[in-house]
């Protein structure tokens, strides 16, 4: 579609150019507008995540000149929430004036402009930026600022479509709402206010979404109970460390198993580097659409079939959990458990496209309780041999930990690809390329 559109643009420009011929090219809008003889061109810009992170750090440092860190929540590499309530009186500025001042300071120091959403709560600030600010005419510095409060939100956005434009409303939510005749935030708000005798009432939303309906109803009315203080004080009841990747082409069962081993070893090194241990591994493997394109295979396939977000038929993903005997960061134990889990849940006949791996219930290694263990003794167990076995396992763990630490030190000093295994050089292996990336993108 993009190629066809580009060809049409080139053809249209050729018709308008002097003599019907294009001479030279440009990707600059102003040059193209002033010189009809130039062909439309483009710039290929590979991602540079390390550079983006450096700019993100510099921008955050600029915000710190105005706002204390306890009033800033970094939402993503290019987005932050700021609670400026207590700063407006100090600076003698309105919220819009303070936002513009900070954005202009960022522009001066980094050359990057920004869009800002201002709201009476976190949700409205997010919606003001995501939906409203995009349609605001930028000033001479390219700055776009939009404001919302509960009243203006209802006046301006209760009839806005699609629902997926709103924060935390994905395709699944929107589809389920529309199947029940709810197409806008206004519809959801009115539904929540319905009486028990009506079809559209609060109970309908709770039947559809469970406890998540509470937040959906709040957002429909423009309310947000979460505050900056609540974000800063939040401590998750359970932590996890994980990674995932989308393979560049469909992988066979055997080749995907190689990727699972690679990912597991990298995950374990990450645990060791952070002094963490885990007692549970979770693996999710997504299959490729190519599996169902072969009519003969599709005829014989007896597994569950799902429809992806693009409307394509695809075998249901494989998902499983493996509980470990104890908290550990042992490469051998975790790799063995993950491989066993992979072999148990994945269909060997299917091609694989996505892999996600997580270590659940992670805690600091120092938190492992050193408690005495007790057992009923008998006359048939060689307790001396058993104690010797425990001692050998302890020594083995210590040797493995020393090797893990040595590998980490080498990688930190000489780069992530300084130490590799033979499997990392096999066809289809991805570790070397992923080590050159940050967050799945080119560094």
Feature-to-residue mapping (PLM):
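Nucleotide/phosphate-binding catalytic cleft detector across ATP-hydrolyzing
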Residues: 1
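Gly/Gly-Pro- and Ser/Thr-rich, intrinsically disordered tail segments characteristic of DNA damage-repair
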Residues: 4-7, 11-228, 384-443
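DNA-contacting surface of Y-family translesion DNA polymerases
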Residues: 39, 165, 173-352, 371-372
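Alpha-helix boundary/capping detector
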Residues: 89, 132-133, 242, 286, ...
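Residue-level signal for secondary-structure boundary sites
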Residues: 90, 124, 291-293, 365-367
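A glycine-rich phosphate-binding loop feature that marks nucleotide/adenosyl-phosphate handling sites
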Residues: 120-123, 218-221, 277-289, 351-364, ...
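Acidic, metal-coordinating catalytic segment for phosphate/diphosphate chemistry
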Residues: 311-443
């Amino acid at each position: 579609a993009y190629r066809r559109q580009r060809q049409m643009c080139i053809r249209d420009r050729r018709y308008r150019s002097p003599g019907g011929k294009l001479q030279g090219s440009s990707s600059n809008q102003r040059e193209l507008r002033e010189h009809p003889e130039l062909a439309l061109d483009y710039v290929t810009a590979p991602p540079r995540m390390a550079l983006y992170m450096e700019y993100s750090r510099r921008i955050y440092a600029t915000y710190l000149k105005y706002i204390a860190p306890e009033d800033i929540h970094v939402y993503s590499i290019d987005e932050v929430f700021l609670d400026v309530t207590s700063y407006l009186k100090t600076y003698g500025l309105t919220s819009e004036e303070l936002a513009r001042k900070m954005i202009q300071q960022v522009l001066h120091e980094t050359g990057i402009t920004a869009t800002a959403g201002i709201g009476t709560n976190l949700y409205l600030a997010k919606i003001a930026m995501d939906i409203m600010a995009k349609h605001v005419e930028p000033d001479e510095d390219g700055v776009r600022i939009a404001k919302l409060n509960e009243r203006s939100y209802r006046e301006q956005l209760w009839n806005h479509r699609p629902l997926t434009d709103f924060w935390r409303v994905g395709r699944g939510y929107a589809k389920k709402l529309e199947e029940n005749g709810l197409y806008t935030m206004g519809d959801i708000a009115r539904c929540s206010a319905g009486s028990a005798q009506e079809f559209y009432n609060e109970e309908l939303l709770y039947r559809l979404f469970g406890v998540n309906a509470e937040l959906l109803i709040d957002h429909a009315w423009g309310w947000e109970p979460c505050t900056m203080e609540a974000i800063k004080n939040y401590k998750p009841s359970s932590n996890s460390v994980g990674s995932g990747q989308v393979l560049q082409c469909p992988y066979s069962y055997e080749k995907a198993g190689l990727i699972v081993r690679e990912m597991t070893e990298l995950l374990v090194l990450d645990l060791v580097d952070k002094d963490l241990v885990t007692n549970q591994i979770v693996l999710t493997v997504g299959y490729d659409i190519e599996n169902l394109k072969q009519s003969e295979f599709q005829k014989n396939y007896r597994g569950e079939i799902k429809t992806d977000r693009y409307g394509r038929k695809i075998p249901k993903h494989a998902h499983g959990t493996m509980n470990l005997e104890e908290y550990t960061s042992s490469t051998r134990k975790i790799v063995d458990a993950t491989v066993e889990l992979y072999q148990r849940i994945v269909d060997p006949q299917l091609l694989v496209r996505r892999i996600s791996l997580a270590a659940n219930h992670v805690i600091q290694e120092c938190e492992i309780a050193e408690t005495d263990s007790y057992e009923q003794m008998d006359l048939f167990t060689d307790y001396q041999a058993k104690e010797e076995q425990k001692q050998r396992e302890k020594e083995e763990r210590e040797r493995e930990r020393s090797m893990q630490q040595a590998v980490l030190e080498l990688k930190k000093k000489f780069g992530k690809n300084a130490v590799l295994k033979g499997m990392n050089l096999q066809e289809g292996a991805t570790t070397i390329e992923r080590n050159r990336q940050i967050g799945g993108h080119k560094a």
